[in-house]
Amino acid sequence: YEGVVFLMGQSVDEIKMMNENTIYAEAGCSLIKLCRFALEHNLTGLEFAYGIPGTVGGAIYMNAGAYDGEIKNVITSANSVRADGTVHTTEANKMALAYRSSCYQKNGEVITSGVFRLEAGAYDDIQDKMVELMGRRRSKQPLEYPSAGSTLKDLRDSLQESSLRTVV
């Protein structure tokens, strides 16, 4: 095998506040850790991600989402490493974020961190939403077992588009 393997784990999981509503998180940081950090700082917007298995890097890479929320709604920028070793910052509006996709799936860059802008919220409200969504997940998924992620795709837009073509 010719190439490089990046292991994004506990050595690449720093998380910190940049200002009152902006969080910086490294790619190896788990989404659960990021969501709990936001909760501790009374910041809302990431509740949808609580319980999604995976890391910040993976969530940015595939524009992770659930329960009407997506990474594209809260990310402002991401840092990555290009094949030539240079570090690059991409603003959210240049990431081509769409349903479960981003520019990183085509450009080969390795995501190293992300910056998220959230809104001020009430701790109890944020926690209640996280608990509610985790309860919904538990009722539908066997969370006690390892997960390879989503195996289903939301086809609502595709079906509507297909239906429109059929009608026209």
Residue ranges and their predicted role:
Residues 10, 29, 33, 47, ...:
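Conserved active-site and cofactor/substrate-binding residues in soluble primary-metabolism enzymes
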Residues 1-3:
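A short, glycine/Asx- and small/polar-enriched loop/turn
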Residues 32, 38-76, 82, 147, ...:
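A gly/ser-rich beta-alpha-beta helix-loop segment of oxidoreductase catalytic cores
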Residues 16-21, 60, 109-113:
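Acidic/polar active-site rim loop that often engages polyanionic ligands
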Residues 81-168:
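Phosphate/pyrophosphate- and phosphate-bearing ligand-binding catalytic cores of soluble enzymes
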